[in-house]
A protein has these predicted regions:
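Predominantly soluble domains enriched in secretory-pathway, periplasmic, or organellar proteins
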Residues: 1-328
Length: 328
């Protein structure tokens, strides 16, 4: 019965303008936001109208995105000029730009501490930005290749995957590395944290690991396609969604730590956005040289209910307790 409820189905396959070349996708103010470095644009896709409804142009190499739902603000890493754009999600306008020392790649806003974090893959650093000052206040030299990051509210620490070292670093409020989990696998990238179960899920080469979030001990190992990077948690549905570069999306049963369902899509993409309020998954990617948006949903959710719910964008998308920066 659980397996039937968890099965994914493709709701729509939609053409997007331009050539493929997406960096990150996320939800903001009920819309799907996509960064496109190739065209130096940020595009806003409406799940209801199923088309691009806004576009932010003339920005330099947009990459990672993070959202402060409470203030209606979105932050976008601009790798081309070492800065972070501050965007108002009510009208999709750039309010200001914050300079940083190192080329930013991924961002994470932590509402509990009112802190913005930015990784630099090029310079192997982690920057801390104080938004009250609109300034970078600290740079942590990692001497490793940073990938995904999330905040563990229970332990009040930032967790950061170090891909080339095969480690997960734990960083405290004073911006010091206070611990490292060594995973028995190569190339850890995406993460998701289940606060209730105290399980940390980590994408590694050909698997997703379930770790004890307090000790780092491996609890389970779930086989996955190569290139699986993006992980998105649905605690209400007891599911973990994982996207691989070949376009397949996995639904992992968190009760049994097994893949409940795998759905190959018609596009090649590696970043996903999940709208927990409406149970919809968005995967932008490419197919035969053209840009596409795949919309997926668990088979138990009807199309009518999804569209009725999605037609009320004023309803804020819930923020999970574990804030996560998606894999580029």
């Amino acid at each position: 019965m659980f397996g039937l409820a968890a099965k994914l189905r493709q709701v729509a396959l939609i053409d997007l303008p331009g050539s493929p070349g997406f960096s990150q996708v996320t939800m903001a103010n009920g819309q799907v936001v996509i960064t496109r470095p190739g065209t130096n644009t940020i595009e806003v896709f409406s799940p209801v109208k199923r088309r691009i409804i806004a576009r932010i142009s003339q920005i330099n190499d947009p990459r990672g995105i993070t959202v402060d739902n409470d203030s209606g603000t979105m932050y976008v890493a601009l790798a081309g000029n070492n800065s972070i754009a501050v965007v108002d999600t009510r009208n999709w306008s750039v309010e200001k730009v914050i300079p940083v020392q190192h080329r930013p790649e991924k961002l994470l806003w932590v509402p509990q501490t009112k802190t913005l974090y930015a990784t630099s893959v090029l310079d192997r650093t982690l920057s801390i930005i104080d938004l009250r000052l609109s300034a970078e206040t600290h740079v942590l030299e990692l001497n490793a290749l940073p990938q995904d990051m999330l905040y563990d509210g229970a332990r009040q620490t930032l967790l950061l995957t170090l891909q080339d070292l095969g480690q997960i670093a734990s960083i405290d409020r004073s911006n010091k590395i206070i611990g490292r989990y060594k995973v028995v696998a190569s190339e850890p990238t995406g993460m998701a944290l289940d606060e209730q179960r105290r399980r940390l899920y980590v994408a590694v080469r050909y698997a997703v690991l379930a770790l004890n979030a307090d000790t780092g001990a491996e609890v389970a190992r779930i086989p996955a396609p190569g290139g699986t990077d993006a992980l998105v948690l649905d605690p209400g549905g007891n599911l973990l969604y994982a996207a691989a570069g070949d376009g397949s999306v996995l639904a992992i049963d968190l009760n049994r730590n097994v893949v409940d369902h795998e759905l190959p899509t018609d596009v090649k993409g590696y970043s996903i956005a999940y709208d927990p309020a409406h149970k919809m998954i968005f995967l932008p990617g490419g197919r035969e040289g053209r840009s596409k948006m795949v919309i997926l949903s668990p088979s138990g959710v009807t199309e009518t209910n999804r569209l009725q719910n999605a037609a009320s964008p004023a309803e804020a998308t819930p923020q999970s307790a574990a804030q996560t920066a998606m894999k580029k």
